[in-house]
Amino acid sequence: MQVPEIEKQIGITLYSTDTDGLGGQLRQEVEDFIVKEITNREEGQEGKYLILELIKRDWDTHHLTRTLAKILQVSQKRISVAGTKDKRALTTQKISIFDIDAQKIEKIHLKDVELKVLGRSRKSVELGDLWGNNFRITIRNITHSSEEIHKLLEKTTNEILAQNGVPNFFGIQRFGSVRPVTHLVGKAIVEGDFEKAALLYIAEPFPDEPEDTRKARQFVKETLDFKEGLKIYPLHLGHERAMMNHLIANPDDFAGAFLVLPKNLYRMFVHGYQSYIYNIILCRRIEKGLSLNEAVEGDVVCFKNEHGLPDSSKTEKATTETVNAMNRLIKKKRAFITAPLPGHNTEFASGIPGEVEQAVLDELKVPLQGFNIEETPEMSSKGTRRELLLQVEPKFEVAEDELNPGKLKAVLEFMLPKGSYATTVLREYMKVDPLQMS
């Protein structure tokens, strides 16, 4: 089954299910994508941190925390969340605000934002608090008959359940939905070419961008005239504009230009390149006929933490003596086979899985020591491992599509652990271009 070209660009070359795609469209309205955070936190009534439940509709998480900080007249650093949620979605999550009076929250009136005080804590809301997310997602505008829709949903679900889940790919959001450039920038950084990296991010045009944006990028790409570029770059391209301002003041300091960006953004470039390599290794492993749910000698296996989630810091290599015991743990969901997100100090598999990993690194000419980035140590990565299989048990229902008269909609519900992508599950059902899912 043919995979969309844009997915091939991010290292995804296959589907794990053989059933024909449902087609359809996601996010026709915001409520079609509902996300509820699952955490292990229980709040009390004491502590410096005010803990709130945040329900937001069609808000970017970072934009919202910036807005809240402005209203409350506090530093944005005092507001923390356990995870960034989708923008075009209805999402529920916990946030914490340091040293703020609960009464001040009552004065916040933002469209499509609801804040409810849950209590206080001595500890801020952090990434470690997040277990996962519950999703309820509506696929609309499906052209098949009711009988065909039920059949396709049932067959795909049965395939997913039979293989205990889907490949744990990094989804298109990791790379940029309209402009999948993150991993290309990261590759140039790891290769030590900061000029190429900066120009890719600032000036590489993509066909699905608005025309004025494409033209502005093309101008800077051809002329390297950042002063003129600032005059024509749309104001919403704030990160690119900040980098150009730095380069006007500090010509040729391409490495330094990245450090004017928010830390979570500039770290995403190297992570994006690692994610691209991981996606390719995962596909090659499947093409080689290696299981994602049964270890072979040489596999690096990680174990579950106290919450039952994969812990990539606890790994062990399967040997002739241990592989059967490890597979018993894998069947009980207490252990998980992994693939590398390579860095300058990564543990690689041996045996046949190791050959797959090494072949991809050789083919891509990945300079592992390049992940130790002297110019910008903040971007360096020693690497880690990530579980190959995204264990998921989707449930579905079919109903009349009230937004598209005469058609039906499918509603999927499932839970995913943190760090995984709902679109990785949805792509197996829909089998469409990722832009129809964004």
From Swiss-Prot:
Keywords: Isomerase, tRNA processing
GO terms of biological process kind: tRNA pseudouridine synthesis
Catalytic reactions on record: uridine(13) in tRNA = pseudouridine(13) in tRNA
Signal peptide range in chain numbering: none
Enzyme Commission code: 5.4.99.27
GO MF annotation: an example: RNA binding
Enzyme class: isomerase
Active-site residues from the entry: D86 (nucleophile)
Record PANTHER family: PSEUDOURIDYLATE SYNTHASE PUS7L, TRNA PSEUDOURIDINE SYNTHASE D
Domain TRUD: 165-390
Gene: truD
Chain's role: Could be responsible for synthesis of pseudouridine from uracil-13 in transfer RNAs.
Family the UniProt entry places it in: Belongs to the pseudouridine synthase TruD family.
Keyword tRNA processing appears in the UniProt entry: yes
Gene3D superfamilies hit by this protein: 1.10.1510.30, 3.30.70.3160, TruD, catalytic domain
Pfam families: TruD
Protein name, per record: Probable tRNA pseudouridine synthase D
